[in-house]
Amino acid sequence: MAALVLPNSLPEELAARTFLRFLRGAPRPAAGGAAPLAYRLAYVHDLLVELARHGLAAPDAAAAAFGGARPPPAPAGVPAAAARAAILTVEAATRAQSESDLWTLLRRGLATASTVRWGADGPHFPPTWCEASTARCGTPDNAALIFGRV
């Protein structure tokens, strides 16, 4: 995936695409539950699709980062190594803009994903603390975060 050159400030519509909002609109999993990792990947994938739709990324950016397909929200759907590779690909493509709105959104979104309580029927709501702001702030020292841990 080629480097993404994004404006430091994303359009308001994109800056508002929090992980919580993504989860609220995500389909509920079939019997057997869903992997929290798969939802994280689907969120990052959807952000890349929206960046492309707004002309801020190549039309194939999401496909390039995820090996040509949307990650399915199912436990067996995404091997851990493939998930890590996809996220690191996105991080590498945007590393020069670590203070951009995209990284702020991803830091908060992926931290939110780590704190959501998951059950057999998917995420339990509401982790409302992430609704307050997506303003930039220091990166927490959390091993669950990839973005910002170069």
UniProtKB/Swiss-Prot annotation:
The organism's taxonomic lineage, starting at the top: Viruses, Duplodnaviria, Heunggongvirae, Peploviricota, Herviviricetes
Gene that this polypeptide is encoded by: UL12
Domain of life (superkingdom): Viruses
Family recorded in the similarity comment: Belongs to the baculo-herpesviridae alkaline nuclease family.
Name of the molecule in the record: Alkaline nuclease
Entry EC no(s): 3.1.-.-
Pfam families: Viral_alk_exo (PF01771)
InterPro entries with a match to the protein in the record: Restrct_endonuc-II-like (IPR011335), Viral_alk_exo (IPR034720)
Keywords linked to the UniProt accession: Endonuclease, Exonuclease, Hydrolase, Nuclease
Keyword ATP-binding included in the entry's annotation: no
Organism the protein comes from: Suid herpesvirus 1 (strain NIA-3) (SuHV-1)
One Gene Ontology term of the molecular function aspect: exonuclease activity
